Amino acid sequence: MLQAMRAHFPIGISPRKVSKVGPRFHAHLSARGKRYRYRANLGWAMPQDERFVLSMKNTILDGEKMQLAANILTGKHDYSAFSASHGKEDTESPVKHIWRFDLVSKGKSIDFVIEGGGFLYKMVRSMVGALLDVGTGKLSPSDIKCILESRKRTEVVVSAPAHGLCLDKVFYKRILG
């Protein structure tokens, strides 16, 4: 069944597992959280097999400061400053819980791994964009704290491009058929 499903998905999207679920299961409403992975390639050439990465040729990033900033963004906070408004602000709470925000180096690339119970529109890309600015010295970890506490989106927060972002996993409540 998994192979048959894969034939209907576009290139780059590949389901890994199929499970039988009950009639009350809802793909969105039954989810308890998600893991996003954002990959930036710091080398000169893009790997041929990785189409979904941000290319930052020959960029040097301060990983220690970026992880400090990621730690500030971890926890339960109002993430309004890291959301791009798109009309849901009256119905969706800006308070979200980020369980994990880690930076994982893999050769010439760096993965931003973010897990949480919910996300606002463009929140992950905005947080990654802010951390990239910390890594290049445009912002400091204390700037990230001030931005988070301000609860206001400003031009200082620039969203990272979409092509580095991947929904890596959806965490579900126990789902039995």
Tell where the protein language model's regions lie, with residue ranges:
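Structured-RNA-binding interfaces characteristic of tRNA pseudouridine synthases
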Residues: M1-G177
